[in-house]
């Protein structure tokens, strides 16, 4: 199973439990919370490894040890089966191996099969898409995760990260961001010249920052 799917399921259980509790159905809420407890414990046992990051995929004895950005959702979401120390370990490895000025790499340079350049024929570009190119929309969840861990002290870092994306607003499609970037310097913009999901995530982070700056 994919790590992000399991995290989405855990988050959904906790979210619905809170909703039904507010609606007055305490028994159902308690049942959902109990299921979430079991799910969360299993999540940590299955996906967290001795290096402090999360396996990207597990199916029986088959485990994907690649360092990929899907684990950042476990730190960014409202509900997580990880404790604060575990969340920080995940954030640290994402920062060290996946963070670029333009987004998060889809694969760490230290992992096998790394291909940061979205160039060449279609089949070659398709391979690079998930093997090392940087996706700006993932930066939104990364910055949200960073603020969850560091709170007010993380604001200046997040604001500096946004500068790297501001420069792109006049480089491709004015007022927008391209679909993706090469994972290595000079981080050239690639794909569609304007990608709504990227813009939406940056706007969401600006809104989140405004709450801290009140």
Give the predicted meaning of each segment.
Residues 196-214:
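Terminal, non-catalytic domain-edge segments
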Residues 117-152, 203-207:
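C-terminal substrate/ligand-recognition segments
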Residues 1-4:
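Short, small-residue-biased leader/transition segments that mark boundaries at the very start
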Residues 6, 132-136, 192-196:
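Short, conserved micro-motifs enriched in small and acidic residues
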Residues 6, 13, 139, 143-146, ...:
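TPR repeat positional signature
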Residues 146-171:
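C-terminal hydrophobic structural anchor segments
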Residues 16, 20-23, 27, 146-149, ...:
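Long alpha-helical scaffolds in large eukaryotic adaptor/regulatory proteins
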Residues 10-92, 96-111, 115-117, 160, ...:
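Catalytic cores of carbohydrate-active enzymes
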